[in-house]
């Protein structure tokens, strides 16, 4: 009996897992450096600007970048974390310091992982930039998934649609109508092109305050946007899969960049499936900001806002107060939540 042929995605996943295992095996001694007190300097404040498998790059108050080990007692360290660290009196195996503690986070972005439970991505974020693209098509369902995460994390969101240069006149009108759905409920939107430069000045101005993070599926052009905003970084850009239209992951670790006009930008690895399995039904419902005015006014207290009689949300949809596409996506999220909850269980992130 012949073996089943693996898809390109399956082959890449196997290769990636194999590479990670080899990396951990070859470098495990590096993470086991036994830093004694007499080998370290004074305690200092710093910010994590890059996170690797067993190390992190920390920026001190003078702007110097130091590669550090992590104390085994630390549960998680992510880009954007404000940490307490100590510099080694000498460099050991390419490492110059150790992170001793993580300051309390103002907020964090997490995503569920099938094997590791909830996995933090970044911390202390002022703004989430949801990057989508007009090709292969503009997915409002994926945008809504990201918005639920933004609302549950209490982090402001901006919707950015890239590759506007590929739009015909008719398609541009259609995308404009789709974005109007979000503008009506208070979200800022931008239709841009990293290739032609359309509206890139507006995006750059938006990033000039606080710390922003780009999130979005692979292939939407996050790396191309970073190349435009920070040409000196020369982030690697990936080629779209001819089969699926989804791009291969081109960023291997989360990084924080300082922008010349002010502000910081975090780029994180692409996420093809941004799961919401760690959220319950109530959290997803609260993730739809236009629902808030009507919640608590349904006929029945346990209304699920699906096919229940006397549902105030359904009535608002019929009266044009809630967009039907958003309500349809809500149905999809709740259905997928019910299906996944029966299969998976996720632990809390710390």
From Swiss-Prot:
Q: Which residues form the CP-type G domain?
A: 106-274
> Which Pfam family is one of those matched by this entry?
RsgA_GTPase
* The record's free-text note on cofactor binding: Binds 1 zinc ion per subunit.
| Location, primary (coarse class) | cytoplasm
Q: Transport: present as a keyword of the record?
A: no
Spans of biased composition, class Polar residues?
Answer: 7-20
Q: Which InterPro entries match?
A: G_CP_dom (IPR030378), NA-bd_OB-fold (IPR012340), P-loop_NTPase (IPR027417), Ribosome_biogen_GTPase_RsgA (IPR004881), RsgA_GTPase_dom (IPR010914)
Q: Where does the record place a coiled coil?
A: none
Q: Quaternary structure?
A: Monomer. Associates with 30S ribosomal subunit, binds 16S rRNA.
HAMAP family in UniProt: GTPase_RsgA (MF_01820)
Report the protein name in the record.
Answer: Small ribosomal subunit biogenesis GTPase RsgA
Instruction: State the species of origin.
Output: Histophilus somni (strain 2336)
